[in-house]
Structures are given as C-alpha cells and as structure tokens.
Amino acid sequence: MKKILITGGAGFVGRRFVKFFLDKGHHVIVVDNIAPLTGGIDPKNGWPLFNPKDYKNFKFHNEDCRSWFNRSKDKEIDYALHLAAMVGGREIIENNPLAVADDLSIDSHYWQW
C-alpha cells in the first residue's frame, strides 16, 4: 500500500484518480480548496463517484495547497499527483493574468515542498 498525495483531488480529473487509488487499497491524501465550478462537492459526503465514509484510508484537507505545502512536513508520501490549478480553462489564461500568477504560485509551492 502506497501513500499518495493528490492536490486538486476534488476536480473532475482528480477525483477519478482518487477513486482509482482508493479502490487499489492505497492511502490517499487530497488537498483541495473546493473552488467554485468544481462540481458541487460536499467534502464530507457529496463526492461524485464515491462516498468518503466508505474508505478508512482517505484523508481530505479543505484548504489551498500552498498553505498545506508550507505546513506539511510529511516526507512519507510515496507519490504526488499535482493537479491543483485555477478553474476556468483557456478563458482564465487569456483574460485573467492574476489567475495565471496564482497558478504559477501554486506550482512553485509544490516544487519547493
């Protein structure tokens, strides 16, 4: 059993990875701030695809991953899938330079962690 960190694990792609690894028996840690447009997730019991209460090896941190990276000293993580990003696609990239700067900040915190 591996310990897997998934940032952005509440997003469309992330929650599919979460379920995949949970079904394989791995310990999964998700860090996600549940941004608007994520799909109406209730962190405690409203996840599409699975019910968090069905898995003892699931841990969810409802926060910006930058804060989690700054605080976490967990070096026992076997794999990290960094999927956290600002939600909005091409429109955000082309029309909101501040959101792009936020995305770069998120990535920077990941690589420094």
Regions found by a protein language model. Name each.
Residues M1-W113:
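N-terminal Rossmann-like NAD(P)+-binding domain of SDR-like oxidoreductases, especially those catalyzing
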